Amino acid sequence: MKDLMQALLTAALIACVPAGAQNVPEIRFDSVANALQLPADIYLGEVGGVATNSRGDIFVYTRTGHPTITIGTARPFAHGGSRLFEFDRNGKFVREVGKDSYGFMFAAQVRVDPADDIWVVDQMTNMVMKFDPQGRVAMLLGRKAEAVPVPARASKGDGSGQQSDLFDRPTDVAWDAAGNIFVADGLGNARIAKFTKDGVFVKSWGKKGTATGEFANVRSIAVDAQGNVYAADGGNKRVQVFDNNGNFKTAFPNVGNAQALCMTKGANQVLYVSNSNPPNDIDRDGEIYKMSLDGNMIGKFGRAGKLPKEFGTVNAIDCRNENTLYVGEIGNLRVQKLLLH
């Protein structure tokens, strides 16, 4: 009976692995111990985002802090539920950026652009905030719901693909070589919005659905050197690829529940994709795939779990260095520094 149960469990686990990923080579890797040195009075919560700048400084946007909620005439005003920390390249704590910001409530992602500006995506305030390297707010996209009624457009979407510069639970941000800004308006609206480098809305594409060009959700996005946009359509278990204007090009179907994407720099770009289940799901899958930009699997590493070299819902990957990754986890409340061999 015990042998039968073990066989059934093994078969079930194999069935959970995406078909195209079952024979992918394993990439050897290590997890660096104590990669981030936190002060005694600071802790990480669920890690929405992790990113590095050109100097190697590390930024972590985490769901921790002390939310402040004030009941207004019609809606609550809330802020402070997430915090943005900076560490130097050796993992030593440097500072907190944007403390008590109006736009910080539920950390979705942090990215650093080619000019070392820091971009924060917040899922609850429906805002994307750009900070300059000194930590000053330089641009805002989206709009938070007002604490009192005002004549304003609603940010709530119905997933129908409406053309709007407002968001409903955005998840990620990326840029092309010309500086155009792409926002994954991923959970409420299931679309990708394009803005000029000055923050002027251009267009959006996508809506709720399962057909080509539609999304169950857009968990993460990345842009390659040619300006193509890659979207992690986790609910539909695929990565979709579009040109710079939102025209569908192709899809990668064998990536499991695609949650986090990261595009490397340089001439020979590769894409990292996390196959992550929600934190309350069973401990299965959890690996990260390394892929060529034509969708071929180069290798994979890691699995679901709580130990070093295991992952608990990877929501963010930083791959400025192709073989030195920072991985932010929701389920394990941590950032791991990984060295790939």
What positions do the PLM features span?
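Eukaryotic scaffold repeat domains enriched in small/polar residues
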Residues: 20-341
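N-terminal secretory signal peptides that target proteins for export/translocation
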Residues: 1-3
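Bacterial N-terminal signal peptides
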Residues: 6-16
